[in-house]
Amino acid sequence: MSELSAAFAQKSRIAEWTLGIFCCVMAVYNLFFSTPYYVFLSVLGLALVFVPRIAEWVLHLQKDYLLRLTSYLYLFLVYGIGMIFNGYDRIPLYDKVMHTLTGVLFGLCGLIAFYFLKPKQNGKIVVCKEEFWQAAVFSAGIAAIIAIGWEIVEFVLDLILHNDPQHVLDTGVNDTMMDMIVCMVGALLFWLPMHSYYAKGKRGLLMGIFESFCHTNSGGEK
């Protein structure tokens, strides 16, 4: 485990418990004051708390507490506030902000996936300046797949629940297209800190998460 990852171990555990407690409280609240749909969302949220741990186990990754913390904060904003609390409808522009954030973070996930799939050199993850555009296009592609996949999920939910999560009745295809567009904008915005890291070695917040992953999983080098 890298020193950077270890420094966030306690904060990661606090975020994990906070997300779980939030889902439990909202499940009880929705049981008495809302609909079965929101009770289901709250209970499902409890399952999502374990997603980072499950992903590590399935992919045989080492524990990276900084990446875990980022995942819990993202789940809280996108799922906890956005879906369980219904923030997408209650808070102006929250939907578009979260889709942009999704583009940024899944661009980061795409970059991590690029080096996870890339053959290691002497058992280590090695980042080369020359492969910036390869990694950048790959990361944006992952974000695009997620954006399209999410819209497919919303379409399927509408077929089952008839709750129009894509707002087709009042916006036509506008909401769906804007969601995908701002997600891609977020993925392209991620290229800025990514380029600074490749060109100048500037780590920053987002690339710090990436570097923590590299060092935690087989001692990455740049």
Name what the model sees in each region:
Residues 1-19:
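N-terminal membrane topogenic signal
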Residues 31-37, 61, 84-94:
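Membrane-interface helix caps and helix-loop-helix hairpins in membrane proteins
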Residues 6-7, 54-67, 125-130:
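Membrane-interface helix-boundary motifs at transmembrane edges
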Residues 41-44, 62-74, 96-99:
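Cytoplasmic-side transmembrane-helix entry/capping segments in multi-pass membrane proteins
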Residues 103-122, 159-165, 184-197:
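Membrane-interfacial alpha-helical segments at the cytosolic side of multi-pass membrane proteins
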Residues 132, 174-222:
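Primarily interfacial, aromatic-capped hydrophobic alpha-helices that serve as membrane anchors
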Residues 85-86, 90-95, 144-192:
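Interfacial helix-loop-helix junctions of multi-pass membrane proteins
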Residues 49-53, 74-82, 107, 111, ...:
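Alpha-helical transmembrane segments of multi-pass membrane proteins
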